[in-house]
Amino acid sequence: MHPLAGKPAPKKLLLDVPRLERAYHDGRPDPVNPAERVTFGTSGHRGSPLDGSFTAAHILAISQAICDHRRETGLTGPLFVGIDTHALAEPALVSAVEVFAANGVDIMIDASGGYTPTPVISHAILSYNKGRTSGLADGVVITPSHNPPEDGGHKYNTPHGG
């Protein structure tokens, strides 16, 4: 058993959320540095503003790319958007929604501002698209999934739900 099991976390292990948020908003990725570029893994882009791999600039660019993709492929249904409990989820949500709104995308988001697990977004997309051949929905989840608490993530879900 870990020696800290059942005990409050020591201050040195706690995340400095204001520092993280400042780095998210103020960070300017260097496009020459591959570690700071937008990089999609198995399910979206993940990284940390502390190393320049997840900043507002990343989210703005990814969100605009999603809008461009929707326009190019004729996706006109709603975009289901969810977030998790990671510290950067809410700042990244604001960045993403600004881009989606500026592009006239119909956004479906939890009305109470709550957290939305990834499978809920997938289910919403599949339920909405069932029996449709046009006006299909897709989705975004602001989450780094299982990554460390200082990370952020931006996942895109196609009209097939994943």
For each feature predicted by the language model, list its residue ranges:
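N-terminal small/polar loop signature for handling phosphorylated ligands or for N-terminal nucleophile
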Residues: 72-150
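An N-terminal, well-structured beta->alpha segment
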Residues: 1-98, 133
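Phosphate-binding chemistry for phosphorylated carbohydrates and sugar-nucleotides
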Residues: 11-14, 19, 23-26, 103-115, ...
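Metal-dependent DNA phosphodiester-chemistry modules and their immediately adjacent helices/loops
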Residues: 149-162
